[in-house]
């Protein structure tokens, strides 16, 4: 039985994850962390200020974190102090925050950290990598769309796309939304859309002189991210104490 605490328990993702864990026969939802007190499927949710005492009391196997960057760093450090494995789906970390996370995790606890836990998105990333290897002389444009409340832009998933393209194509200049007179350079265009309740759309256009190839992924429900995070939570227990990605979970 895998015991789970959800951080960001009262948010959209936290509620989805809590539901899946609560219904899973091989898992136990033992509580949640958020900015305020509450309940998550009849389990206690405490403020983040009480996280150390809460983890010590509940003794979970895994903490699943979907919060914001600043809060997530503190949650990760607390989990590492208490020997709790981590699933981190929070995005928007600065380079300095990433270094802090690595220092807290490495050698202490296993952690799966990913900008997107959807199985489909991880396959999408693999396809983008393969396309970039074969189409290095094509122009490349990245577009992402999310709901009006998403705080970071570009999305973490889009940033991962750009990292993959940089690895395969070299570090091209990024053109973030074009306006006025433009001239095509050795660059990658990046376009961000925010509106409505869009769960998450990502596409990469490879444009050649005589053809275009577009690789895209569209999420219809946040449950797809929650399901992937819970799958990772099952996988991470008992692993060596270091940072993993969702592609490790999937064996890609």
UniProtKB/Swiss-Prot annotation:
> Where can this protein be found?
Cytoplasm
Range of residues in the leader sequence: none
> What does the record give as the active site?
146, 150
An example GO BP is: lysine biosynthetic process via diaminopimelate
GO CC annotations on file: cytoplasm
Q: Which reaction does it catalyse?
A: (S)-2,3,4,5-tetrahydrodipicolinate + NAD(+) + H2O = (2S,4S)-4-hydroxy-2,3,4,5-tetrahydrodipicolinate + NADH + H(+); (S)-2,3,4,5-tetrahydrodipicolinate + NADP(+) + H2O = (2S,4S)-4-hydroxy-2,3,4,5-tetrahydrodipicolinate + NADPH + H(+)
Task: Report the principal subcellular site.
Answer: cytoplasm
Keyword annotations for this protein, in alphabetical order, are:
Amino-acid biosynthesis, Cytoplasm, Diaminopimelate biosynthesis, Lysine biosynthesis, NAD, NADP, Oxidoreductase
Q: What is its EC number?
A: 1.17.1.8
Gene Ontology MF terms: 4-hydroxy-tetrahydrodipicolinate reductase; NAD binding; NADP binding; oxidoreductase activity, acting on CH or CH2 groups, NAD or NADP as acceptor
Binding-site residues for NADP(+), renumbered to this chain = 36
Q: In which pathway does it act?
A: Amino-acid biosynthesis; L-lysine biosynthesis via DAP pathway; (S)-tetrahydrodipicolinate from L-aspartate: step 4/4
| Family, as annotated | Belongs to the DapB family.
Q: What is this protein called?
A: 4-hydroxy-tetrahydrodipicolinate reductase
Q: Which organism is it from?
A: Methanoculleus marisnigri (strain ATCC 35101 / DSM 1498 / JR1)
Its taxonomic path starts at: Archaea, Methanobacteriati, Methanobacteriota, Stenosarchaea group, Methanomicrobia
Gene expressing this chain: dapB
């Amino acid at each position: 039985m895998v015991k789970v605490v959800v951080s960001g328990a009262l948010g959209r993702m936290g509620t989805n994850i809590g539901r899946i864990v609560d219904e899973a026969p091989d898992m136990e939802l033992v509580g949640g962390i958020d900015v305020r007190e509450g309940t998550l499927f009849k389990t206690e949710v405490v403020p983040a200020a009480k996280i150390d005492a809460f983890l010590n009391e509940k003794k979970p196997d895994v903490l699943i974190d979907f919060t914001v960057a600043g809060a997530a760093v503190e949650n990760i450090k607390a989990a590492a102090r208490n020997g709790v494995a981590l699933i981190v789906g929070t995005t928007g970390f600065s380079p300095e925050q990433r270094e802090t996370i690595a220092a807290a995790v490495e050698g202490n606890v296993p952690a799966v950290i990913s900008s997107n836990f959807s199985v489909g998105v991880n396959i999408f990333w693999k396809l983008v990598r393969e396309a970039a290897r074969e189409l290095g002389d094509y122009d490349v444009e990245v577009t992402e769309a999310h709901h009006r409340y998403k705080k970071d832009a570009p999305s973490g998933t889009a940033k991962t796309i750009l990292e993959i393209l940089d690895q395969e194509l070299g570090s091209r200049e990024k053109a973030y939304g074009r306006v006025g007179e433009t001239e095509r350079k050795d660059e990658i265009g990046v376009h961000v859309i925010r509106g409505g309740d869009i769960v998450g759309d990502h596409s990469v256009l490879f444009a050649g002189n005589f053809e275009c190839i577009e690789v895209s992924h569209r999420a219809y429900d946040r449950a797809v991210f929650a399901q992937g995070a819970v799958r990772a939570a099952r996988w991470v227990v008992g692993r060596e104490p270091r940072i993993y990605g969702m592609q490790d979970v999937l064996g890609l």
